Amino acid sequence: MSRGRADTAGDCSKNGRRSRILHYLMAIYLLNGLPGGEYARFIKIARLLDVSPSTVSIMTRRLQMKGLVELIPNMGVRLTEQGLKILSNYLWKSAILEVLLARAGVDIDNCRGMGLRMAEGLSDEDAWILYKVLGEPKYCPHKKPIIPPDEINAENARQIALCCGISILQIPNNRLQPPS
């Protein structure tokens, strides 16, 4: 893949819908639902997102139709390579924005949430420009590795959440509760 404009938005053009998609992809990721890995159970996703299991069922079927998840009845759901690509692109943008904000003097504790909120509105093209202007940073302000989205695969995917110290509670526009 070239480092130009990646087609990661897919059918996620509306902000609200895209935000919901990112919430589900993040929840599945946090429950170890990586490509070729474990399956995240609907009930655990429902608890994490504070929605009903039937809502999870409906949304994951939609994600499956978009090619973002693999869904196995009575097993659960896990990300496809395409779903991982969309999620990793979002988290990479967030990390780049964290670096920019930290260099601009924003308190490191505020960078994380601000970066996540701003990442949804940042185009792929603009993110690559920022990445280059910032000197292709290797670490976020929290000293976690930044992995460009074109270098993410199922083997190193576990590191992307660490890039921003991500927690499901920091995804913008959420109604999420801490996992129990």
Curated annotation (Swiss-Prot):
Coiled-coil residue spans: none
HTH dtxR-type domain ranges (all copies): 17-80
Top-rank taxon, per record: Archaea
InterPro entries noted in UniProt: DtxR_MntR_Metal-Reg (IPR050536), Fe_dep_repressor (IPR001367), Fe_dep_repressor_sf (IPR036421), HTH_DTXR (IPR022687), Iron_dep_repressor (IPR022689), WH-like_DNA-bd_sf (IPR036388), WH_DNA-bd_sf (IPR036390)
GO molecular function: DNA binding; DNA-binding transcription factor activity; protein dimerization activity; transition metal ion binding
Record family assignment: Belongs to the DtxR/MntR family.
Protein name: Uncharacterized HTH-type transcriptional regulator APE_0142
Protein source organism: Aeropyrum pernix (strain ATCC 700893 / DSM 11879 / JCM 9820 / NBRC 100138 / K1)
